[in-house]
Amino acid sequence: MPAFTQYLVIANVGIFLLQLAGGGGLVQWFALWPGDGSGLASLPLLTPWQLVTYSFLHGSLMHLAFNMFALWMFGTELERVWGARRVATAYFLSVVTGALMHLLVAGAFGGGRAPVVGASAGVFGLLLAYALVFPNRKIMLLFPPIPMPARVFVLLYVLLELYLGVTGTQSGVAHFAHLGGLIGGWWVYRFGRSGPRYRRG
């Protein structure tokens, strides 16, 4: 596994273990708190570090496992082509754009006082970048197990997230944070500079 992807997975797993060990304060201080920040009244409305730190926290083992699997799957391939710096830029920019999108939607439509945790926005940014770099690479769905080109997979996933976000069918998931993460991945694909050059085989 390339270095950045490996270190990022290790960091996420390590912080989740701290959460399990009783680090309830981690969520209070480092999750993304929209709305009036009612989870911790002494905090300001929004502290800047939350725009990044929320991505290192996870709500459950399944939440962590799914995100780390996707991070390994897409981040590994991208890092081999782009290099660590560009992948890191895409990931963390996606984390920030995902947070900003969630705050914008929560502020405009309300109902967004629950804290947001998880690496999903960063993963979505890498997923879009992966589909742009490898549009015809086949991705196998977990359920149902149907292979499809990466570009089709991303399009279907985006439409599903948009539907779930607008209708509120699946509560407890920050769908607009996921969608906002796409912006960071696209931006780095469009305007970022690659790391090591490579030849197509």
Describe the predicted segments one by one:
Residues 1-201:
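A detector for small-residue-rich transmembrane helices and their helix-helix packing motifs
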